[in-house]
Amino acid sequence: MTDLPFVTADLPGSGGALRRAPEDFRVDEVPAYLPSGAGPHLYLRVEKRGRTSRDAVRELARALGVPERDAGCAGLKDKDAVTTQWLSFPVARDPDPAALAAPGLRVLEASRHQNKLRTGHVRANRFTLAVRGGDLGRARECAGALAARGLPNFFGPQRFGAAGRNAAVGRALVTGERTPEAGRAARDRFLRRLSLSAYQSLLFNRWLAERMADGLFAAALAGDAMKKLDTGGLFTCEDPAADGPRVERFEISPAGPMFGHALRLAAGEAGAREARLLEAEGIALADFARGGGEAEGTRRAARLRVEVALEPLEDGYRAAFELPRGAYATVVMRELTKGEAELPEDAD
């Protein structure tokens, strides 16, 4: 992310080291809904340490005597952290949660619900991070600026793979370039979707970086696709003078392109900016139909509200904040520290 701008570039970062131990990084999943208490699916809220979400699903499915494929999980959490999340299992009996404990895994809560938990049934993730050796005073200045200016909703480096290889493979799939890596991805649905998503994310980051460079991060342009931050609804900006104050109040945000073959470009000046980005890449929207047609395209909010709570530690500080599904804690922490450390993120 070293080529991406900071919204707090005028402020020095706190410095410091992130994630020296799993306990330094905690992620608590905020579900889209809570289990109702009745139904055929057993819902378990689990805490894991040093275990992946797949490890937890496998362990619990075996203990409950159900096939692993029947388990439900809203999002995958990294193993190098302390995380909590809900999992679901089609089990008639109500087991003793204590009996399901395993190394690095414990059940915090059990309930029931009518439906299986599905990927994406997450409202947000709550992050708590320790920054060892960080300057609390500087962190507070950056956090205050973030609260006022908003968080650029960049994708973190985890999205792109080592040295950006996933995005490079995705571009090859879109352009039709024949490479060994693109050939493998074309035959493997998981790799294909991963690579195409990485390339879409790279182009979104470029779009947002250009917008920030032109002083349009918290502005409304004629023709902008706008997203309502409370409901996710989309509309076209027809009156920038009216929509601009709503952007500033975090009611709405420009919604940048995750380019795809079914996406419609924004209108007016905003659409012209998107078209120039595609032209610079030498691609057209229709090119995203290559590789199985799975890159249909969508819109992503450019600017988010984030409130970071800070407290001192003996050797640094602790930061706590909540982000909507799909936003990256890495982006928040690089604004606070001005470092480029990579953090585990929700991999849903």
From Swiss-Prot:
Active site per the UniProt annotation: 78 (nucleophile)
Entry GO MF terms: RNA binding; tRNA pseudouridine(13) synthase activity
GO biological process annotation, one example: tRNA pseudouridine synthesis
Keyword Nucleotidyltransferase belongs to the record: no
Keywords assigned by UniProt, alphabetized: Isomerase, tRNA processing
Domain TRUD: 150-304
Record EC number: 5.4.99.27
Leading EC class: isomerase
GO CC terms, sorted: cytosol
Keyword Cell wall biogenesis/degradation found: no
Recorded catalytic activity of this chain's protein: uridine(13) in tRNA = pseudouridine(13) in tRNA
Family the entry assigns: Belongs to the pseudouridine synthase TruD family.
The protein's role, per its UniProt record: Responsible for synthesis of pseudouridine from uracil-13 in transfer RNAs.
Name the record gives this protein: tRNA pseudouridine synthase D
Organism of this sequence: Anaeromyxobacter dehalogenans (strain 2CP-1 / ATCC BAA-258)
Origin organism lineage: Bacteria, Pseudomonadati, Myxococcota, Myxococcia, Myxococcales
Gene name of this polypeptide: truD
